Amino acid sequence: MSSLPTSDGFDHPAPSGQSPEVGSPTSLARSVSASVCAIKPGDPNSIESLAMEATKASAEFQTNSKKTDPPPLQVLPDLASSAEQSLAMPFHKSSKEAVVAGNLEKSVEKGTQGLRVYLHTRQDASLTLTTTGMREPQIFAEEKSWHPENQTPSPVNGLQQHRETGSVQREAGQQSVPQDQGCLCDAEDLELHEEVVSLEALRKGELQRHAHLPSAEKGLPASGLCSCPCSEALMEVDTAEQSLVAMCSSTGRQDAVIKSPSVAHLASDNPTMEVETLQSNPSCEPVEHSILTRELQLPEDNVDMSTMDNKDDNSSSLLSGHGQPSVESAEEFCSSVTVALKELHELLVISCKPASEESPEHVTCQSEIGAESQPSVSDLSGRRVQSVHLTPSDQYSQGSCHQATSESGKTEIVGTAPCAAVEDEASTSFEGLGDGLSPDREDVRRSTESARKSCSVAITSAKLSEQLPCTSGVEIAPELAASEGAHSQPSEHVHNPGPDRPETSSVCPGAGLPRSGLDQPPTQSLSTPSVLPPFIFPAADVDRILGAGFTLQEALGALHRVGGNADLALLVLLAKNIVVPT
């Protein structure tokens, strides 16, 4: 008998009629299991060698089973028929063959299962190494998570287990079939190997798909596998953006300094202004700052408004510093204006004094100095023509001079009047003008009526002597009466001049034109009636204003406007007469 060395170091005799490989099934199972279990996870070549050994062992087992013709285990009628047909084969031989076949089947099944588990673990570990490239602790955690003890069932695992059980059943069926089906065992074994390879490829594809998905069972997020390259890329982008921001902020600061120093100061103090100047620069394109630009639109508007306010404040301060004088400068300006107006007042008084000195000679009695009054009348007519071309302010000054002339020559007119009626009416007219300071309206009305009567009497008396003195009397007396009556008497008295107009027109037909011209101011005063309320002012102030060449009504109006201050009233009246050349 031949003996086979086993793993335990003893030689077991092989039974007669059997090959040495089949004679010791226990040693064969031990050798196969030892060869399968001695796996080192470090060398990938051992996996292929073990797979080749397993396939060789299965092939040898199939050839031995063909030679020995073992009876099937599952089909009992076949076993009984074979026992009846082969009477020479003892019963213990068939039982030993069944035990050997069962041991071989179990050993092969265990070896294939261990090999598949190791292949599965090895492929997962290599897949994690190639896809993630992570550190050794992560690889260790990955291998630990894919260990069969920690692995959770999944549809792919369930499918693989189902196929594994199916393959085990196929192997059991292949080993239990009779000899006539032995040729099909090799084909099925090859198909099983191909299915295992395809299943492993499918498993690799599924792992590659689900490598980026988060998994709660692993304890580590699957998205963290790609965190290292992604974080490196993001850090590179961040550094590029920071360099771009630094360059653009420097250029933006230079532009801001060139444009406006205040905005540059704000940009150096406020970091948001640096980003705004960066984004306002067209050469700097924002990379991923769309949200930042939207958030910084309002601060930019606020900064623009603040700069505008600062500019407005600066401009207003400049205007207030240069355009508007201070209190001291205003006082100096007023004092200088006061001095200038006083000088102007003195000039006006000096210019009016020769006319007042010459007026008594011209306003003498027409009957006594008819021939001598002709030059004066021509002079007055010339002045009248000049007054037509003058401005209203000049006309006011001329009227004031005429009034001063008439007032200064009041006594001489009274003393040299040709008749008593003219003397009485002239005295009453000038007394009425003097009484115009009182607030009684009846006195004012009497003064105007007496002035008109004196005008008519003067016209009638002058008609007897000459025609020209008549026109001169019409020019002087109605002018005084109209200037006083237009401002002092009520509107109904101005509108109704009285029955003296027909006498004037009938006695002196040449006086109609100046009367019509002098009736226009009362009609203008109707639209804007200037009836002043009665005020009592000091006579000295009124005389002072009258001495400056202004009318009584102008003096009263100016005093009423400034509240009784004679200096201010005089300044107001002088300012009205100033004509600025253009």
UniProtKB/Swiss-Prot annotation:
Basic and acidic residues bias (residue ranges): 438-452, 490-503
Tissue-by-tissue expression: Expressed in epithelial and subepithelial cells of small intestine.
SMART domains: UBA
Subcellular location: Cell membrane; Nucleus; Golgi apparatus, trans-Golgi network
Region of interest (Disordered), residue spans: 1-32, 56-76, 143-180, 303-325, 363-384, 390-409, 426-452, 483-529
Effect of deleting the gene: Mice show a specific phenotype: first, a post-transcriptional up-regulation of SLC5A1 in the small intestine, with an increased d-glucose absorption rate and capacity; second, an increased food intake that results in a visceral type of obesity.
Domain UBA stretches: 536-576
GO biological process: intestinal absorption; negative regulation of nucleoside transport; negative regulation of protein localization to plasma membrane; negative regulation of transport
Key word ATP-binding present: no
A GO CC term assigned to this protein in UniProt: brush border
Keyword Nucleus recorded: yes
Keywords: Cell membrane, Golgi apparatus, Membrane, Nucleus, Transcription, Transcription regulation
Biased composition (Polar residues): 16-32, 148-179, 390-408
Self-association state and partner proteins as the record states: Interacts with YRDC.
Protein name: Regulatory solute carrier protein family 1 member 1
Gene (name only): Rsc1a1
